[in-house]
Amino acid sequence: MPRSALYGRRFHITGSIVEDANIATVAEVTRAREFVKALVLDLLAKGATFVIPVDAEKNRADGQPICFDWLVWDTIHGNLARRPADAPGPLVIAVKHHKNEGQIPTEYRSVWDAMRVSPLVQIESAAHWNMASKRMEVQAQHGDVLIAVGGGEGVLFLANLYHDAGKPVIPLNFGLGPATTGASRLFDFGMSGSNAQR
């Protein structure tokens, strides 16, 4: 069976939801999270690899996680058997800051403890940078493809880094924030006028 074109490509899934549940409804957040999980499972089965930050898991007032990072970590950890035996490594490049160890959510501590000692994970420290933009630069250096889900200025910053390096940026069209920023803005830009390839 021929290998997928995704085999060995390193994917970086990034984004967030807004605090306002009237903008990012529970139903839309659930739909986005289910999509991200299914996407990670599919990529994993096709031999793809990942860049994932190690950070806190902040929740909205209604309990919805604001970011997708720990969903990606947990999905990979729970489905390692789906990965082709001959897939290239490392499976994950984990980008962390010296403060992050203490910020790992209790419910994902066992996931991190197992993954951080695995030969499937390469840890890249951004400990010398306190600025989020510098940590994003480290992430972008390792990724091949950026997939954006919601988000805001951070998503736009990462998208520029990937674009400037000639790497694909794939914005997903979920209603997780204002249309004027993040993946929604990128999606609208890509679909408008001469930017769209139909």
Regions found by a protein language model. Name each.
Residues R3-R10, G15-R198:
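Acidic/glycine-enriched connector segments
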